[in-house]
Amino acid sequence: MNTPAINLETEKQLFFHNYARLPLDIASGKGSFLYTASGERYLDMIAGVGVNAIGYGDKRLEQAITEQASKYIHVSNLFMQKPQFDLAAKLLEISRMSKVFFCNSGTEAIEAAIKLARRFAARNGDTDKTQVLSLTNCFHGRTYGALSLTAKPKYVDGFEPLVPETGMIDFNDVEDLERKVSNRTAAVFVEFVQGEGGIHKVSEAFIAKLKELAKEHDFLIVADEIQAGCGRTGAFFSYMPFDIQPDLVCVAKPLGGGLPLGAIIGSEKVAEVFTPGSHGTTFGGNPVACAAGLAMIEAILADGLMQNALEVGSMMRTAFEKMAEKHAQILEIRQYGLMIGVTVHREAKYYVEEALKRGVLVNATSNNVIRLLPPLSISKEEAQLCLDTLDAIFTEEAKA
């Protein structure tokens, strides 16, 4: 077989056109930087869209992967596997919850949570309790159940009809929450910090009312921690600063240390809902991914990366606020740990392209939001490089 050229022309020939790829042939990574095959260096402020929490080339992560891979890479979930036990125990210790189910991705975690919520109601005799709700501007995934809970029309276009008995509550609208939930509601899914939606945090008032209504109507509260979890906001899970304990927590992205891994974590209330055969997966909880996940979590805890997320994130927010005083292009700044959204006056894609030319990788979401999701291990000096780059772009844009 001839080795294909690595460029955008070949990419169009080989793949379905799912991604608007950047013209970079990535060869390696170290710390907060990626390197191309031609030797160019890029500061990665995307981190695999929030996956690479401890950066690239961490020896502890590499050792965990190679040690487990040398023993076995896969066996059926019909067998007990130490990497699964170790990671599940760590997640339950952190969350103070009751049970774990491993899958392969965030969207699979959402699907499992939808199934569990409906089965929980059915097993309690509430066969009409099938409604599953989410919030506007949310993103929960691309498989049909998760897609049905996802707000943006561009993800839904052409895929209707979606799963019935799903719907949206207006984000942070307490009155709409009261209107939408009822005794037919099985679950409400919440991103406590919306990532794809532009880095927006749910309000204390909304969560207080959600708790009250969940008790009144006996529905489950599901925290989607796929992007905001594993320390990114400065707490291990973004729901933790709120006065709430969800019934289910969905986790993925950084959970596998860069390998495919997702999970739902359940409270004692839902601990007995799944029974053998009611839900499952061939590859979920892959032992190599679980070993990597444990190493990743231990690195976050040992290296104080949640505190680093708070400190570097605060430093970046302050810098952006000063930047906004001289650059009218910046309309709003939202920052929760190292989840940062900067609303700008035009399509954010422009700034993505300009930063790329200068060796910095940033992301655009919600049309006019620059989204930054760097490794939690990023230094203040590296963050300053990103800030200086964006400052220069804003300055040059104003002169044009």
From Swiss-Prot:
- Residues found modified as N6-(pyridoxal phosphate)lysine: 253
Its UniProt pathway annotation is: Amino-acid biosynthesis; L-arginine biosynthesis; N(2)-acetyl-L-ornithine from L-glutamate: step 4/4
- Positions bound to N(2)-acetyl-L-ornithine: 142, 281
Q: What cofactor is needed?
A: pyridoxal 5'-phosphate
Q: Which UniProt keywords apply?
A: Amino-acid biosynthesis, Aminotransferase, Arginine biosynthesis, Cytoplasm, Pyridoxal phosphate, Transferase
Q: Which SUPFAM superfamilies match?
A: PLP-dependent transferases (SSF53383)
What family is this protein classified in? Belongs to the class-III pyridoxal-phosphate-dependent aminotransferase family. ArgD subfamily.
Question: Mind telling me which HAMAP family this protein's record contains?
Answer: ArgD_aminotrans_3 (MF_01107)
**Matching PANTHER family:** ACETYLORNITHINE AMINOTRANSFERASE, MITOCHONDRIAL, AMINOTRANSFERASE CLASS III
Tell me what this protein is called.
Answer: Acetylornithine aminotransferase
Which source organism? Chlorobaculum tepidum (strain ATCC 49652 / DSM 12025 / NBRC 103806 / TLS)
